[in-house]
Curated annotation (Swiss-Prot):
It is found in: Nucleus. This is Zinc finger protein 221. A zinc finger (C2H2-type) spans 170-192, 198-220, 226-248, 254-276, 282-304, 310-332, 338-360, 366-388, 394-416, 422-444, 450-472, 478-500, 506-528, 534-556, 562-584. GO terms for molecular function: DNA-binding transcription factor activity, RNA polymerase II-specific; RNA polymerase II cis-regulatory region sequence-specific DNA binding; zinc ion binding. The keyword Metal-binding applies. Residues 30-100 form the KRAB domain. GO terms for cellular component: nucleus. SMART domains: KRAB (SM00349), ZnF_C2H2 (SM00355). Its main location: nucleus. GO terms for biological process: regulation of DNA-templated transcription.
Amino acid sequence: MISPSLELLHSGLCKFPEVEGKMTTFKEAVTFKDVAVVFTEEELGLLDPAQRKLYRDVMLENFRNLLSVGNQPFHQDTFHFLGKEKFWKMKTTSQREGNSGGKIQIEMETVPEAGPHEEWSCQQIWEQIASDLTRSQNSIRNSSQFFKEGDVPCQIEARLSISHVQQKPYRCNECKQSFSDVSVFDLHQQSHSGEKSHTCGECGKSFCYSPALHIHQRVHMGEKCYKCDVCGKEFNQSSHLQTHQRVHTGEKPFKCGQCGKGFHSRSALNVHCKLHTGEKPYNCEECGKAFIHDSQLQEHQRIHTGEKPFKCDICGKSFRVRSRLNRHSMVHTGEKPFRCDTCGKNFRQRSALNSHSMVHIEEKPYKCEQCGKGFICRRDFCKHQMVHTGEKPYNCKECGKTFRWSSCLLNHQQVHSGQKSFKCEECGKGFYTNSRRSSHQRSHNGEKPYNCEECGKDYKRRLDLEFHQRVHTGERPYNCKECGKSFGWASCLLKHQRLHSGEKPFKCEECGKRFTQSSQLHSHQTCHTGEKLYKCEQCEKGYNSKFNLDMHQRVHGGERPYNCKECGKSFGWASCLLKHQRLHSGEKPLKSGVWEEIYSEFTASFTSVSLCGRKAI
């Protein structure tokens, strides 16, 4: 493999005086300044860390070639990749046999590796160059006993600047930066008045020097010549591949000095360290929110602009962040690269695997101070707290409906657009979200992976299991402000509040009758059609709702999953348990007026079902 610096040399970005034979005669003395390329701090800031390292390597190689032009050029095959501790090692061998038969061997010191994401500033790069330049010059000076007069162009050695290692006497009047080498100082001064004459044809970005333009153009070319042997992922820079491979090996060489946490890259460590210092230097001009990293600010600003530059080629869905597009793409491919070692379950995201792992160790580090409920991850804890505060910060611009979470708003907005991007392969039914499609697919295969440890009941969705478990725990976090009644689920509270307000938003188009719940409307509509979709396999009795079928099947199975903690009596239905518990608590049912309204509505609905059933017969 040819080194990045040699690649630049071969592409014509950096050119040196041609060597004719064994010696080169210069009409004018060649200095390092003549072959160096300088970036301004602004231009250098546009390069990623790997490109900065490449720039540094090119500059180092410039003066190495300058030192060796009086001798045979060094061999390309003397470059060796050293892996973790050192990046490139170059042995520049110049051999000349004088009359004394002596041999000259000049070995440049190994350039230490910069971490794949280490931020090299202009000053650091040029100090490294100046330091290596001085070492190389001393090597020639120490080996001068092997040369005869005229063997090496004296002008080169004479014009190579000698660095002041301990001092920095050269100070820039523009930016007050100091330098130890006069050549580096001269080159730096050019950066303040540099004309940007090299323009990118793709995006119009301008640069002072052609090498900077060529490095930038690789972003548009999209060339990815470095491939991971483990997962096949491709990268356009070898340093990015090295960082990625640490994900597979688990290597985290960059440790935080305060908390000891390890990271794959130095840039990730630098971002983490700002958590300890509280530094957030990047501020949003729209809302004033501050961020640790500039990339976080750029992603946040897209919320204000509405920009979603990352589009899925399969379904056309757009995203603000590339990582979310990558995560979304796995929905179409079915890829789940993160596997739980305990139960073998696979996940699309490492964070989901980490959250799942806590299920096995039963650790719930985040506790709600109001209700005492524990949570595995902080995100779920923050979501839960909105239940108590009633906060709903996400508004639908179409209908004004508010939501606690952005994901719920996104799902709701698809109702207005009518877009159902997730199709069931079995029956072709469309769904707004992948989770709903996954839940639906379990109706085809009968899978119920979520099991209640109390009563052994199985559920298709985790949410259904969590709702069911509240029956056993007695948890009722949702309170009615009108009558003080508490409920286990927000949907039950909403339905109950309609009794106080008298709201009946669900209307039958056949007879005009209105209902407080959509399920009541669906059950009522079967009266007009006479349809009974749900059949009992044991007695073949038909029902117009699955709920009624489930209730009926308990008659055959003798199932009584609801137990009274006071006396141990068991019941087939939660409503029967609730009524029974009032005997122990002395709780009175709803006020007569409200109860009469519920009863009249129930009997009317029941009567209409019965009448329609008789007509169907």
